[in-house]
């Protein structure tokens, strides 16, 4: 079987890889906020988990511990302070997951890739038009999308930047 996916072309829209102004970053938040708002009443549990355990922090933490034990690249000693920082926060690692499981946080439709280049902006006004790249949409916590957007927005380099010294966290946006 062959499957095709098609989209409507959004005239007079632009897609930015990095924000050129603080307003660009703000408009990405408007786009994803609108996405969340429009899907507030959608039964998120009906969605398929397209990337299993993507935001399951306890599962990621277990994988970290296993990798640290093996240290396959023999680099753990070089980042010991960072490792200790992560290990010291084990008690908090499952907070969101536990709250979702207990029903203390609502299960929502989440995008899970809330980067600026997943929001089309009007070419003239630069206002958010729509959210795109919906292949990662699945059930989760809206905190996932918020955290991912902050991760992207505060970064000083592209997420696939090879030179790690270019990557910092900017608090100016």
Task: Indicate residue ranges for each PLM-predicted region.
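ATP-dependent phospho-/nucleotidyl transfer catalytic cores
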Residues: 10-34, 41-111, 116, 120-130
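Short alpha-helix boundary/capping segments
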Residues: 19-27, 138-141, 166-169
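A general structural signal marking secondary-structure boundaries and capping sites
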Residues: 36-39, 43, 153, 157
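Short glycine/proline-enriched turns and hinge-like loops at secondary-structure junctions
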Residues: 122-124, 141-144
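Activation of the activation-loop gatekeeper triad in protein kinase-fold domains
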Residues: 132-137
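Active-site activation/catalytic loop segments of kinase-like enzymes and analogous catalytic loops
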Residues: 143-173
């Amino acid at each position: 079987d062959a499957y095709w996916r098609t989209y409507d072309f959004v005239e007079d829209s632009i897609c930015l890889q990095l924000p050129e102004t603080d307003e660009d970053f703000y408009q990405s938040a408007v786009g994803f906020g609108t996405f969340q708002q429009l899907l507030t009443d959608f039964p998120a549990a009906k969605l398929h988990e397209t990337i299993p355990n993507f935001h399951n922090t306890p599962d990621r933490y277990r994988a970290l511990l296993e990798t640290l034990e093996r240290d396959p690249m023999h680099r753990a000693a070089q980042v010991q302070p960072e490792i200790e920082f992560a290990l010291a926060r084990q008690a908090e690692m499952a907070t969101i997951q536990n709250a979702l499981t207990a029903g203390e946080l609502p299960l929502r439709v989440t995008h899970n890739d809330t980067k600026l280049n997943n929001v089309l902006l009007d070419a003239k006004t630069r206002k958010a038009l729509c959210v795109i790249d919906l292949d990662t949409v699945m059930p989760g916590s809206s905190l996932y999308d918020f955290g991912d957007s902050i991760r992207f927005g505060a970064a000083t380099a592209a997420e696939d930047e090879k030179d790690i010294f270019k990557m910092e966290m900017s608090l100016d946006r």
